[in-house]
Amino acid sequence: MSYNVRAAIIGGTGLYSLEGMELIEEIFPDTPWGKPSDKIKIGKYKGKLIAFLPRHGIGHFLSPPEVPNHANICALKQLGVEEIVAFSSVGSLREEIKPLDFVLPSQIIDRTRFRNSTYFGNGVVAHAPFAEPFSPNLSKRIAQTAKKIGLEIHLDKTLVCMEGPLFSTKAESHLYRSWGADIINMTVLPEAKLAREAEIAYQMICMSTDYDCWREGEESVTVEMVIANLTKNAETAKKLLSELIHVLGNGDDLSLKNSTRYSIITAPEKRNSETVKKLRVLFPEYF
C-alpha cells in the first residue's frame, strides 16, 4: 500500500461511514490474517488524510466474536497508521453514566472467552505490556477537544469486555459492578491488544446507550434501545470528531515505537518460519 495514513477511525455500531469525508480510494487488502471487516475508506476529512474502517462491516453483518481484528489492525498498520480512535456503544454500570453520555475508559477487564488476542504464538512468543491499555496521550487530546466544544465526558473509567453476542444476565451485570467496572461492551478486545502489539496508539470513545440490566425499574437493554440512542448521539459524535481530527496523526504519541521488539522472547534460531513470514508483514524491521 502506497499511502502514509497516520490516523484511523474505527466505527462501531451505527457508525458505518464518515459524513463529509472526501473519498480518495477504497481498499480491501489481503493480509496474512485474511481480509478486514469491510473496505477501508481513505480520504480527506477536514483537510486531514485519514482511514475509516467500519468494525462490523457496512450493514452490520459481523457479530463481535466474528470481527476480523487481526486483519483490521494489520491493514491499518500497513497504511502507516500510528493512532486509532475507535467508537463503540456501551452499557452503563453506574447511575451517573446516563444513556447518551460519552465515556473515555482508561482500563479494561477481559471477559472474552474464545478470541485469539495476539499476533504471536505458533513458534514465536512475545509478551507485550498492557498495564495501560489505552493511550494516555491520545485520551488527553480527546478530553481537551470535548471540553473545547462543551461536551461533558466521563474520564478514567473501567470498561469490561464480554464475549457476546448475547447481553449480560442480571447476575453478571451486578458482578461487574462489584468489581468496579463502569461500562460494558463486546468489542474493545482483542482490538486494543492487537493495536498495542502493532505499536499503534489506541483510544476508544464510548457512547452509553442503556443501563445494561442491573438497574431496578429500568428496561433491560435491547438492540432497538441501542440503535435509538446511537442515532440521537450521531450529531454530537460528528461534532467531536470534526474538531478532534486536527489533533490526530501529528506524531504526538510515539511512546510505543519499537516496544514490540523488546517483547519478543523466542531465540531467532527457534522461530517458526511460517509465523515469521506472517509477522514480517507487520514488523519488517524485526524479522
From Swiss-Prot:
- The EC number(s) this enzyme carries: 2.4.2.28
Residues noted as binding substrate in the record, renumbered to the chain = M186, D210, Y211, D212
GO biological process per UniProt = L-methionine salvage from methylthioadenosine; purine ribonucleoside salvage
Protein name per Swiss-Prot or TrEMBL = S-methyl-5'-thioadenosine phosphorylase
Question: What Gene3D superfamilies does UniProt report for this protein, alphabetically?
Answer: Nucleoside phosphorylase domain
State the gene name recorded for this protein: mtnP
Q: Which residues bind phosphate?
A: T13, R55, H56, T187
Protein family: Belongs to the PNP/MTAP phosphorylase family. MTAP subfamily.
Bilayer-crossing regions: none
Which source organism? Leptospira interrogans serogroup Icterohaemorrhagiae serovar Lai (strain 56601)
Q: What does this protein do?
A: Catalyzes the reversible phosphorylation of S-methyl-5'-thioadenosine (MTA) to adenine and 5-methylthioribose-1-phosphate. Involved in the breakdown of MTA, a major by-product of polyamine biosynthesis. Responsible for the first step in the methionine salvage pathway after MTA has been generated from S-adenosylmethionine. Has broad substrate specificity with 6-aminopurine nucleosides as preferred substrates.
What are the GO MF terms of this UniProt record? S-methyl-5-thioadenosine phosphorylase activity
